Structures are given as structure tokens and as C-alpha cells.
Swiss-Prot record:
Keywords attached to this entry: Nitrogen fixation
Gene giving rise to this polypeptide: nifZ
A GO BP annotation: nitrogen fixation
GO molecular function terms listed in the Swiss-Prot or TrEMBL record: nitrogenase activity
Domain of life the protein comes from: Bacteria
Keyword ATP-binding: no
Pfam families linked: NifZ
InterPro entries assigned to the protein according to its UniProt record, in alphabetical order: Nitrogenase_MoFe_mat_NifZ (IPR007415)
Protein family (similarity comment): Belongs to the NifZ family.
Designated name of the protein: Protein NifZ
Species lineage: Bacteria, Pseudomonadati, Pseudomonadota, Gammaproteobacteria, Enterobacterales
Length: 148
């Protein structure tokens, strides 16, 4: 098993990194690093004899977080990022209707459950009060999570 990334190499996180309970001072499930964030490899080690874990320093937040190899790409690799990601809290920007009946009001809060990049652009599956709807990116806005 050889590491894919070298010391001091700049890398990008391809998915949100949330606390699995191993980072003190953060609740389990708390957002630690947003996908698309960049950082630098400080060290690496092996977990369960079959996974390389990289110690990544994220200068923007001055955090050092452990990331699995499959969660990282080289900074030189093209990055196609959507605006939102799984579990993001959002607010609906306009009323959404099904067969003329409003089912989601403007301002209603929801949570992203899935993302999709199609020919018509980004769309998201959002849970609004227990009902899931596929909505275009223009219909929702991110509610920023407070990172502690």
C-alpha cells in the first residue's frame, strides 16, 4: 500500500467531512470541512491495515482533519462542484406547487437528501417537512451552518 499524495501536496476534499465522534469539541455529525475545500498533506498513516488516512491542514479554518484517500483529489484535477451538498439546510426561495396546489411555501426550510447534475443543470432532492421533492438550484438557498 503506497500513499497517493505526498507531504505538503495541496489536495481538495470531494465530499463534506463530518465529525465521526473522534474530533473533540464538535458534536458527532457536525460539519468539519465543506466539500471543495483545499488543504495540505501534513502526514499520513494506516487505519485497519487497509486504509490510508491523511492528516490535512485546512488553512482557511486552521483545522487539521483526518481524511481517507477516496475523499481527496489532487488540486490539479478538474473540480465540478455543485452549490449544495448532502445534509445542507436550505430555504425555499419560491412557492412550489404540484398540479396547482402549493406544497412548499416560500421561506420554508428543508434539508438536501441527494444531488444530481443533469443536462439542465444542478437539481436537488430536498426533504421539506417529511416530503421529498426534486427542485432546481434556483428554487433553494443555502442556510449556512455555524462551524464551531
Amino acid at each position: 500500500m503506497r500513499p497517493k499524495f505526498t507531504f505538503s501536496e495541496e489536495v481538495r476534499v470531494v465530499r463534506a467531512i463530518r465529525n465521526d465522534g473522534t474530533v473533540a469539541g464538535f458534536a458527532p455529525g457536525a460539519l468539519l470541512v465543506r466539500r471543495g475545500s483545499t488543504g495540505f498533506v501534513r502526514d499520513w498513516g494506516v487505519f485497519l491495515q487497509d486504509q490510508i488516512i491523511y492528516q490535512i491542514h485546512f488553512p482557511e479554518t486552521d483545522r487539521i482533519i483526518g481524511c481517507r484517500e477516496q475523499e481527496l483529489i489532487p488540486i490539479t484535477q478538474p473540480w465540478l462542484a455543485g452549490n449544495l451538498q448532502y445534509r445542507d439546510s436550505v430555504t425555499c426561495q419560491m412557492a412550489l406547487a404540484v398540479n396547482g396546489d402549493v406544497v412548499v411555501s416560500a421561506g420554508q426550510r428543508g434539508r438536501v437528501e441527494a444531488t444530481d447534475r443533469g443536462e439542465l443543470g444542478d437539481s436537488y432532492t430536498v426533504d421539506f417537512s417529511g416530503r421529498w421533492f426534486r427542485v432546481p438550484v434556483q428554487a433553494i438557498a443555502l442556510i449556512e451552518e455555524r462551524e464551531e
